């Protein structure tokens, strides 16, 4: 008896131990081997007795008893009859739980096709038989016969015959002269008759022979599926079912409701239809019914089985009584409500509660306040056991009573139980791992959970009604993990960027800012203090103010560890702040001897963490929080109407702008400017005005005012809030006290009448109406953004979930080059910030002395980065996840520092998931809109380059000409001007536009702010490179050129018009040529004629016969029209990059280096070819639509990777032409740019991890003598494995090129079918996997969660390792014992074995 009670917790069947899971197609024999009996009747349960009907869908004889250890008729009850089969009702006496495990089956009277293999595209049956889906369906649904064996007749093999044709053929050739069949039997015979080996050989031969690309692809597809069937051991005829399995009844329950009705699973309905139709078919066949009736019944049976497996995939959806589609077996797995995502990947858990959160400012960082009522409920089992141990109760029932009465001893025990037992707090949505953290509970009265203010940033929580959930880690291991890994004190740094995330905000910042203000002319200025006591005395006696400038004697510890005293200029407030600083020689008083804004405070916390360690940081954070709150309260900073200062000059600026707008309106009415130009100019003028007013307002608000009583007055409180970073921003202040500015229409365009009022003055009705558009759109955007961002995160997690740190070093020599990112002259991301925490790939040497500064494989710490920046090194090669050579996972050296800990990354760290969370979490902060760049509204196009540093100019790729006016002009597109400082270190680099006017030349010295170059942002010039006389070609008035008079200036403009649309203009090729003295077209120095092709809308700047010198402008192409393009920004751009989509107007990139040649035009496309420099390569040709402007001329030299036509490059092209490193650099920069605009910091390595996952496939270009098929995409690992095998066998190896897959595609093509099936397109993934007989090695996180094991990351990885070692040891011991047993047959007592040491 006792044994059985213990057994309740252990399943009857021992849990299977397995390392991998294989999925394949079930054969009829297999289905029968699972089954415990055939289901012959559609009945379920008897409506009166509620007992299952015999042979029905719930039959107890087949599936097992309904009550534990009790047969159906009640003859055998209790445990003692276990295993007996009752002779009356034939039910086995056992646990009722077997009804969840035992399956049944239905023998079909006619075979039916499995809909997944038929309809899931591409149709597997169709591919194997090489028949179209339409033909297959015609045969299956009894419309056409198919000839199986033509015999000696004129019919062809597999020919389709309609009813009439079949009868005619029978009359013509006689009944037995040929074999034709119809329905699933026919298909089954066809599949049975396939000889796979022969078919494979034929296909391979055909592939070698074929020239056509399309045919090759088709054959490759067939070959793959034939191979799949051969190697997986599946037989093709198993795709046609003769037996249908029936799942256990407890997985499709039927529950009686009160009132005599039943709630049932849809599957029972679907099974019932199958059984009904099957039985009817059997009966009809026995009765020898007419063919047509039987055929109809067979078709209905096929439809019933289709609906059971996948309702709605073919034909109408079968609906239940309430017009709702029935949920079929496939629907049980699919989608968010399916088995995978609803029950396997996320479950509801025990021991949890949720409540509203309130602020707990008196808590320590590692604590949270837990309401007593909640704690009592959550820790019940612990309390019961402790009551029992103390002898206060003997039974659970008694303990329950005590707890329910809430006796005083229960509270004492609760205190004991809760001591040092951490709980997990979680706030939904959990966007990154900091959304769940562990705290030690502190019991509190009330019903709300108290949360420490500093962790709010990590949870993204505020106290306006947010709720949080509490979970209790039960086992000792769980408690240990919670304490060591998840405690809030261990999560000081943000995993996305390594910056502190436990940073004061709002009130605390304001208090610290107030504390650290220094004001001139206050009482007691210049007094000297020796210690804190004197200072406090003086403050209380009002001799000095918090903000008074004083001198103070500061004691601190020097570098040598001895105390040092020094006198510093500071304020009383800053000294108070200095008291909470940890004593360390690395942290000086200067760290806080300044105005403390949020940024400064964050910097100090970072410094403390780096130099003093975690414990000190936590204590410091708690102290500075208390100080901040106290001083915010003492300061009493409030917010009054008069704090919003409207600048005096506001109306002056508004009036000036109004008159400008009026002028533009007038110019438009006079026809001098177009509507678009007027709109752009007006919008531009108002944007400038808004900026100016905002500047004036800031000037007035931040101005230091004098106090009438002497000294400086209190600082404006709104300014304090915004400047300290506590709340608000200059943009919001502008709306409060400046002017609200321009608003957007719902379509995204800007309304040209701005809102002149601010909130202090109040808006007029019209202004208010105009402002509602934008506000409403903002709210709608926010709602959409959340969903989109969540979906992006889900795709990212899915693609990267199996990226885990598995080894220390993969030993690769590869890496990627890093340099600072410079955007229009300003350094956006310094080299130091990009290489911090990464591993050097090669020795880093000083440029001047060639001395090794940093050895290869060194993890770069802050000190190394300082060394590099001091040495002025511009480029560093570092190791990266992209170049890591490990097969499974990434190595620690290639990954670098674990950003959340600041130490080298640990084994088993799930870096893929962290990367996905780091990129996905800020997704909600990104914008959703597509920017329309319309003219000047956002046209702060840079048209001037000024130097940001003093230095010396160097020019790379130099090509400068002095034009007719004596100006220097840039003649090439890839010219770069660099400014170097006195040591020769490059401080800034600028890309110079083609045709820009240069103000400096090589070797010139420039001062900061001096102009380097300028150009016209509204047009692109075409320049001449030789001196000569102008001639026109094909520039025919009225056909390819038209003259218009510019009314504002009265000058005639000649514009190239679309010559293809004019009469007789189709063959024209308009160009300007430059002729020499002999009247012949001159040659260019780089080869080719001096002929400049013109595109539509070019404006000519010269006349026939004019003399030109190099650098003169021949024509301009106005870019005003090109400026209204859409720029995809924000989230859609990030998604577009990760999905590796081809942009709409993709750039065309030169695939080889060479010379441009213009070929014959083709219809309305231009033909451009590149003559290669390297004679071994073949020339490349590109067809470009004629309207597109090509900025290259005949004879231009292009490098590999140059743009021939501007635009966004397609990432695939970058990969194909420039390789992996360039692609990675492009993706990282583009994605970072989107996040940078929103001020979000993400470390590059996260994006690199995701890009690594996108590059896992190889396309086979030449199959060599391997089993691969050229043109197929194959896993890199598999590709290498097959090549190694071929090499060992002395065969020719295959070659391949890396393929870039978007994240969705990459997730669906992972090695694990479990992971792919639970992501998207479940049906397709499972069908594919079953046909291939795929094995899931259970390597990723997702698969292991699904099968219910520890994940192979973090502590789960260590557990797996320990288990491995244990198994090895056991084996050694057992072998040793066997040996000893063999040597000594009857030794009395063997010596104890010495264990081999652990690995």
Swiss-Prot record:
Zn(2+) 2 binds at residues 810, 884, 891, 894. One of its GO terms (cellular component) is DNA-directed RNA polymerase complex. Its cofactor is Mg(2+); Zn(2+). It holds the Pfam family RNA_pol_Rpb1_4. Zn(2+) 1 binds at residues 71, 73, 86, 89. Binds 1 Mg(2+) ion per subunit. Binds 2 Zn(2+) ions per subunit. Its EC number is 2.7.7.6. Keywords: DNA-directed RNA polymerase, Magnesium, Metal-binding, Nucleotidyltransferase, Transcription, Transferase, Zinc. GO terms for biological process: DNA-templated transcription. CDD domains: RNAP_beta'_C, RNAP_beta'_N. Mg(2+) binds at residues 462, 464, 466. GO terms for molecular function: DNA binding; DNA-directed RNA polymerase activity; magnesium ion binding; zinc ion binding. It catalyses: RNA(n) + a ribonucleoside 5'-triphosphate = RNA(n+1) + diphosphate. SMART domains: RPOLA_N (SM00663). DNA-dependent RNA polymerase catalyzes the transcription of DNA into RNA using the four ribonucleoside triphosphates as substrates. Belongs to the RNA polymerase beta' chain family. This is DNA-directed RNA polymerase subunit beta'. It comes from Nitrobacter hamburgensis (strain DSM 10229 / NCIMB 13809 / X14). The lineage of its organism: Bacteria, Pseudomonadati, Pseudomonadota, Alphaproteobacteria, Hyphomicrobiales. The gene is rpoC.
């Amino acid at each position: 008896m006792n044994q059985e009670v213990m057994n309740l917790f252990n399943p009857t069947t021992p849990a299977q131990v397995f390392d991998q899971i294989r999925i394949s197609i079930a054969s009829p024999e297999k289905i029968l081997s699972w089954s415990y009996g055939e289901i012959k009747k559609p009945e379920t349960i008897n409506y009166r007795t509620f007992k299952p009907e015999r042979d029905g869908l719930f039959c107890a004889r087949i599936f097992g008893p309904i009550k534990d250890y009790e047969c159906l008729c009640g003859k055998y009850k209790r445990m003692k009859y276990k295993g007996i089969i009752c002779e009356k009702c034939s039910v086995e006496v056992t646990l009722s739980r077997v009804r969840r495990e035992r399956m049944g089956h239905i023998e079909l009277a006619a075979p039916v096709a499995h809909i997944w293999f038929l309809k899931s595209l591409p149709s597997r049956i169709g591919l194997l038989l090489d028949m179209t889906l339409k033909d297959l369906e015609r045969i299956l649904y009894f419309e056409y016969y198919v000839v199986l064996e033509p015999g000696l007749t004129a019919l062809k093999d597999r020919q389709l015959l309609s009813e009439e044709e079949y009868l005619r053929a029978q009359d013509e050739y006689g009944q037995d002269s040929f074999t034709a069949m119809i329905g699933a039997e026919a298909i089954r015979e066809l599949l049975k008759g396939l000889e796979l080996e022969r078919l494979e050989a034929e296909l391979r031969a055909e592939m070698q022979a074929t020239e056509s690309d399309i045919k090759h692809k088709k054959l490759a597809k067939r070959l793959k599926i034939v191979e799949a069937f051969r190697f997986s051991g599946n037989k093709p005829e198993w795709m046609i079912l003769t037996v249908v399995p029936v799942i256990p009844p407890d997985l499709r329950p039927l529950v009686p409701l009160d009132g005599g009705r039943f709630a049932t699973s849809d599957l029972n309905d679907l099974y019932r239809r199958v059984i009904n139709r099957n039985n009817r078919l059997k009966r009809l066949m026995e009765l020898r019914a007419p063919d047509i009736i039987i055929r109809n019944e067979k078709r209905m049976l096929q439809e019933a089985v289709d609906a059971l497996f996948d309702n709605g995939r073919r034909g109408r959806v079968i609906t239940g009584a309430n017009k709702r589609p029935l949920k079929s077996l496939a629907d049980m797995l699919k989608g968010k409500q399916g088995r995978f995502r609803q029950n396997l990947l996320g479950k509801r858990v025990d021991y949890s509660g949720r409540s509203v959160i309130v602020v707990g400012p008196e808590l320590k960082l590692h604590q949270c306040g837990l309401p007593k009522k909640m704690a009592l409920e959550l820790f019940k089992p612990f309390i019961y056991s402790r009551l029992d141990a103390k002898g206060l109760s003997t039974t659970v029932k008694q303990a329950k009573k005590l707890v329910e009465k809430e006796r005083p001893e229960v509270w004492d025990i609760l205190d004991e139980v809760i001591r040092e037992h951490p709980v997990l707090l979680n706030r939904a949505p959990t966007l990154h791992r900091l959304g769940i953290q562990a705290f030690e509970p502190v019991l509190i009265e009330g019903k709300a959970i108290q949360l420490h203010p500093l962790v709010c940033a990590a949870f993204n929580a505020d106290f306006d009604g947010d709720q949080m959930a509490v979970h209790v880690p039960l086992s000792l291991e769980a408690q240990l993990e919670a304490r060591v890994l998840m405690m809030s004190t261990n999560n000081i740094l943000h995993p996305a960027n390594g910056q502190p995330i436990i940073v004061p905000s709002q009130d605390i910042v304001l208090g610290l800012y107030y504390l650290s203000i220094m004001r001139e002319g206050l009482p007691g200025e210049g007094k000297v203090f020796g210690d804190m006591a004197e200072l406090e005395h003086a403050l209380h006696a009002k001799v000095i103010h918090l903000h008074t400038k004083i001198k103070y004697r500061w004691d601190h510890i020097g570098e040598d560890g001895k105390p040092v005293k020094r006198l510093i200029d500071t304020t009383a407030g800053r000294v108070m702040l200095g008291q909470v600083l940890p004593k360390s020689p690395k942290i000086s008083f200067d760290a806080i001897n300044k105005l403390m804004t949020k940024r400064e405070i964050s910097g100090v916390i970072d410094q403390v963490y780096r130099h003093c360690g975690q414990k000190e940081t936590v204590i410091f954070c708690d102290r500075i929080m208390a100080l901040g709150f106290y001083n915010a309260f003492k300061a009493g900073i409030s917010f009054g109407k008069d704090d919003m200062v409207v600048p005096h000059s506001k109306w002056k600026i508004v009036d000036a702008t109004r008159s400008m707008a009026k002028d533009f309106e007038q110019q438009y009415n006079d026809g001098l400017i177009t509507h678009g130009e007027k709109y752009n100019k007006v919008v531009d003028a108002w944007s400038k005005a808004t900026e100016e007013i905002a500047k004036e307002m800031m000037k007035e608000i931040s101005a230091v005012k004098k106090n009438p009583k002497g000294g400086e007055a209190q600082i404006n409180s709104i300014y304090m809030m915004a400047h300290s970073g506590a709340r608000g921003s200059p943009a919001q202040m502008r709306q409060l006290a400046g002017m609200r500015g321009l608003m957007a229409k719902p379509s995204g365009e800007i309304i040209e009448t701005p809102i002149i009022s601010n909130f202090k003055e109040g808006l007029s009705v019209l202004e208010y109406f105009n402002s509602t558009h934008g506000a409403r759109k903002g709210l709608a955007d926010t709602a959409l953004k959340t969903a989109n961002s969540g979906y992006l995160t889900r795709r990212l997690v899915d693609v990267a979930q199996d990226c885990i740190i598995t080894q220390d070093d993969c030993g690769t020599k590869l890496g990627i080059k890093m340099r600072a990112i410079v955007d229009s002259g300003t350094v956006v991301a310094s080299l130091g910030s990009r290489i911090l925490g990464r591993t050097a790939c090669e020795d880093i040497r000083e440029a001047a002395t060639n001395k090794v500064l940093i050895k290869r494989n060194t993890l770069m710490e802050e000190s190394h980065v300082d060394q590099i920046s001091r040495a002025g090194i511009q480029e560093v090669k570092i190791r990266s996840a992209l170049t890591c050579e490990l097969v499974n996972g990434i190595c620690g050296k290639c990954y670098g520092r674990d950003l959340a800990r600041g130490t080298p990354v640990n084994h088993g760290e799930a870096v893929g998931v962290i990367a996905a969370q780091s990129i996905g979490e800020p997704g909600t902060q990104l914008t959703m809109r597509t920017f329309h760049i319309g003219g000047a509204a956002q046209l702060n196009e840079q048209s001037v380059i000024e130097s940001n540093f003093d230095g010396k100019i160097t020019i790379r790729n130099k090509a400068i000409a002095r034009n007719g006016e004596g100006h220097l002009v840039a003649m090439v597109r890839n010219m770069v001007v660099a400014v170097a400082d006195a040591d020769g270190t490059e401080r800034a680099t600028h890309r110079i536009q083609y045709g820009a006017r240069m103000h400096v030349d090589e070797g010139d010295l420039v001062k900061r702010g001096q102009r380097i170059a300028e150009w016209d942002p509204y047009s692109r010039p075409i320049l001449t490179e030789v001196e000569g006389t102008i001639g026109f070609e094909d520039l025919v008035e009225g056909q390819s050129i038209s003259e218009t008079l510019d009314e504002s200036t009265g000058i005639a403009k000649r514009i190239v018009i679309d010559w293809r649309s004019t009469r007789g203009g189709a063959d024209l090729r308009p160009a300007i040529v430059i002729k020499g003295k002999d009247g012949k077209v001159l040659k260019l120095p780089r080869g080719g004629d001096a002929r400049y092709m013109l595109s539509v809308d070019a404006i000519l700047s010269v006349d026939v016969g004019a003399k030109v010198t190099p650098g003169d402008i021949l024509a301009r192409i106005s870019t005003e029209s090109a400026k209204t393009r859409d720029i995809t920004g924000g989230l859609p751009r990030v998604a577009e990059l990760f999905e590796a989509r081809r942009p709409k107007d993709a750039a065309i990139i030169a695939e080889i280096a060479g010379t441009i040649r213009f070929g014959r035009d083709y219809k309305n496309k231009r033909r451009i070819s590149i003559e290669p420099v390297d004679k071994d390569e073949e020339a490349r040709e590109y067809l470009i639509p004629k309207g597109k402007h090509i900025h290259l001329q005949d004879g231009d030299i292009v490098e590999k990777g140059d743009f021939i036509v501007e635009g966004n490059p397609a990432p695939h092209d970058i990969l194909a032409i420039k390789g992996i490193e360039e692609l990675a650099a492009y993706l990282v920069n583009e994605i970072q740019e989107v996040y940078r605009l929103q001020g979000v910091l993400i470390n590059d390595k996260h994006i690199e991890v995701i890009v690594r996952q996108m590059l896992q496939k190889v396309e086979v270009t030449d199959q060599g003598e391997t089993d691969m098929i050229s043109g197929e995409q194959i896993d890199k690992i598999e590709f290498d494995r097959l090549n190694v095998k071929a090499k060992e066998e002395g065969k020719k190896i295959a070659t391949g090129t890396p393929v870039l897959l978007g994240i969705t595609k990459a997730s669906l093509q992972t090695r694990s079918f479990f992971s792919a099936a639970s992501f998207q397109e479940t049906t397709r993934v499972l069908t594919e996997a079953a046909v291939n007989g795929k094995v899931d090695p259970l390597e990723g996180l997702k698969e292991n969660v699904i099968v219910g094991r520890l994940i192979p990351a973090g502590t789960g990885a260590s557990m797996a390792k320990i288990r491995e070692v244990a198994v090895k040891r056991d084996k050694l011991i057992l072998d040793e014992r066997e040996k000893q047993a063999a040597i000594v047959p009857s030794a009395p007592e063997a010596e104890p074995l010495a264990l081999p040491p652990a690995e």
